């Protein structure tokens, strides 16, 4: 079988970049290289003063947030290495996944810096790093991830339709639920603080993480689109039922986390509004995957509308050009190259 006849999830380890089968994945890699940032660019000095202004409820929220961030990106990085890189059989896609792994490492470094800055007490830091074990609302989210993602870890090859379906569920959980729902929920709390003029350093770093995570999610959805074209028989009623159930579970797990963060409610942020927001996001993910929405909720947070549209596309353009790594030149994708 020639390289041009292989499908994206066919077993093997394709190494040949010429001719390119999936040039769009390569372009995503190039775009990611242009948007390089470092933790050292994030100034957290003003955040220290802001932390002293927060109420006990708000301080509790921040502690839970940074604990989740550190835990969540570690789960993401492990899945990249153990599952996605192994089974997405495209050198172009693996270039992007290599870049994504670097970005996830930067995110972990950012969250490590947040923990060291926001939690001066060493015991508080240790508890945050061990959040999966000692914070029930974060443990519930981790258990959700393991339920939907771990079944692929021991698969060496995607030989059967059932194997490939399991991989798709892993990928969709990774993109739509972890990066596309859990992190989007956490970002909403960050931008709620920013809308009140607080924690600008956290918001700045989150801007760049938001950008990265959105690109990661978009790449994963393009992988799903490609598999749908190559193997449409995988996308049957059963898969739709499984994905819909997965998103429903993700909303409930994230809402439990929201109850932990918000308690009885804070001015402008409560569990009712967060449920509406999460349901809106879940519907968006289902529609992007080609499935029917189930909630019909609208986004209640105006500060997230701004973030999702204007800032997501423009904030890199506003950064000093010295921080943006340009990639010059073009690549000819002609198969006769």
Predicted regions located by residue number:
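Non-heme di-metal
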Residues: 1-337
